[in-house]
Amino acid sequence: GWRPLPMYDRIGAVYDFVRNEIAFGYNAGDELPASAVLADGIGQCNTKGTLLMALLRAVGIACRFHGFTIDKPLQKGAITGLAYVLAPRRIIHSWVEVAFEGRWVNLEGFILDAPYLTSLQRRFPVRQRFCGYGAATPDLSAPGVEWRGQDTYIQKDGIADDFGVFDSPDEFYARHGSNLSGLKRWLFTQVIRHRMNAQVRRIRAE
């Protein structure tokens, strides 16, 4: 189990589990409980963040939720066609802040699993600023997503609005809602997200 590990290793074990055992993908909604994200075996920033917070707290690590929006172009490539047209111009985004050595450390680099990120790096083999396919980073070739006791980012360069920190994802969604509602949400849940996940799987398999 993770609980007996030193704090640094405990955070790292939970972080690596959520990053790589829960593959990048699109769930039915942002507000899913951690148990549903775990059952899906896939997630994006918000759903993987919910699971990360639940697991960190389960092993005695204090953490909090930081809500944002990101600009839609960050998702272009991972989201294509009708899905991209229907997506809001600014998409609800979040990262997790973990209490470590007397400060809050921002954790965002868990969103893209290593096989998917490696495929992006092969597809775009340049050391430069990159935005698209679920990443927005100053250096795609070395984005700094591994847990080293410091902030990790993979979408930070796409952030538009900052909604501040919350004790839980539920508190945030109660105040700011989620990305889709009504007919758009139904289409996303029943049809579009499956196409998006197929696209992500294609990229990962390259």
Where are these regions (language model features)?
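Generic structural hydrophobic/aromatic packing signal, biased to beta-strands
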Residues: 14, 56, 63-65, 107, ...
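His-Asp-centered catalytic microenvironments across diverse enzyme cores
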Residues: 70-206
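Secondary-structure boundary elements
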Residues: 1-40
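Active-site neighborhood of thiol-dependent amide/isopeptide-bond enzymes
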Residues: 26-92
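Non-catalytic alpha-helical scaffold/packing segments enriched in small hydrophobic residues
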Residues: 13, 51, 95-98
